[in-house]
């Protein structure tokens, strides 16, 4: 990803973390592995945070572009 990805990197990483977390959580439930369930929940939280950062970067970029075009 480039310096000018405007939050795309974080959004992609966030989605990957959320999917990875969901898989870990489900496998943890099926195997009755509480540690794996907890790791899955934590990965989903990290993914949501990264996704939010990506959205904020995207909105900041859109705002700056809007201000420059006035």
From Swiss-Prot:
One Pfam short name: CsbD
Signal sequence, renumbered to the chain: none
Gene3D superfamilies: YjbJ
PANTHER family reported in the protein's UniProt record: UPF0337 PROTEIN YJBJ
Family affiliation: Belongs to the UPF0337 (CsbD) family.
Name of the protein in question: UPF0337 protein BT9727_3385
Organism this protein belongs to: Bacillus thuringiensis subsp. konkukian (strain 97-27)
């Amino acid at each position: 990803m480039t310096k000018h990805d405007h939050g795309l990197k974080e959004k992609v990483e966030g989605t990957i973390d959320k999917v990875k977390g969901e898989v870990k959580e489900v496998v943890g439930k099926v195997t009755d592995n509480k540690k794996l369930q907890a790791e899955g929940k934590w990965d989903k939280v990290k993914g949501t945070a990264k996704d939010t950062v990506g959205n904020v970067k995207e909105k900041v970029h859109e705002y700056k572009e809007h201000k420059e075009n006035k």
